[in-house]
């Protein structure tokens, strides 16, 4: 906090280190940059948690997991391109495809159409 104002933030490890430590789900990419894919997937996970648990003590399940942790490294329904890269999200208004891990939604009306899980790719 700064004075009496709470300042939300997220912390993520050294970005060049993400893909060298196995944080990329695949070493080929649907958009030509698997390093960017690793960063994007992890950032989506952390941003989702910063929105739903900004004080780091708001919501945990019985195992101590935040919402995105419940679906970590689960990617759901995907499409495989001719180069072997999988993708499950296309950025709005672009042709750019990404392979993004899913996040858990408490709304039981929203589920992955294939698995029926509350883990979905956040749009």
Placement of each model-derived feature along the sequence:
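Metalloprotease/metallohydrolase-associated module, dominated by Zn2+-dependent proteases
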Residues: 1-37, 53-123
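Short alpha-helix carrying the canonical HExxH Zn2+-binding catalytic motif
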Residues: 35-48
